[in-house]
Amino acid sequence: MASAEPLTALSRWYLYAIHGYFCEVMFTAAWEFVVNFNWKFPGVTSVWALFIYGTSILIVERMYLRLRGRCPLLLRCLIYTLWTYLWEFTTGFILRQFNACPWDYSQFDFDFMGLITLEYAVPWFCGALLVEQFVIRNTLRLRFDKDAEPGEPSGALALANGHVKTD
């Protein structure tokens, strides 16, 4: 029998970092289209986003594992949103000390120090919902089989309709 193991925290951090980076690029491209009708959809971000999103989503994963049986979904998403604001402010504040903060929300009506803005509350809430329901839950289901050979799945763990066979 194969020895499939859950992904390590570093592996999950990597997946979360890539996911956050991709979403940041897509969000900025969509924002550019909605605000400026730019059909080029130029999405931008910073390499700092890899660390910021990877770490933040890994912490949200820990929150999810502790809260999932105790808190309703919408309350968890509110908690994740508050965490996101705290994390965005903290990382932005630190990066600003080195003139390296890649965002500036000063032009928004409800910004605080240009580092966070209330206008993003709904997108952050929706993002938290999607992260919990799809990204974290599916990432926690992934397994690493250290004995598997590269290539197509075969044997007892061959895929059948997207599900792992266990018989």
From Swiss-Prot:
- This chain belongs to the protein called Transmembrane protein 229B
Q: Per UniProt, which keywords does this protein have? A: Membrane, Transmembrane, Transmembrane helix
Membrane-side (Cytoplasmic) residue stretches:
1-14, 62-73, 133-167
Q: For this UniProt entry, which segments traverse the membrane?
A: 15-35, 41-61, 74-94, 112-132
Pfam families xrefs: ABC_trans_CmpB (PF06541)
The cellular location(s) given in this protein's UniProt record come to: Membrane
| Record topology, Extracellular segments | 36-40, 95-111
Q: What are the GO BP annotations of this UniProt entry?
A: macrophage activation; response to bacterium
Q: Does the keyword Amino-acid biosynthesis apply?
A: no
Q: Which organism is it from?
A: Bos taurus
Q: Which GO terms describe its cellular component?
A: membrane
Q: Which domain of life is it from?
A: Eukaryota
In the record, the note on similarity to other proteins reads: Belongs to the TMEM229 family.
Primary location group: membrane
Give the bilayer topology. Answer: Multi-pass membrane protein
Say if the entry is tagged with keyword Flavoprotein. Answer: no
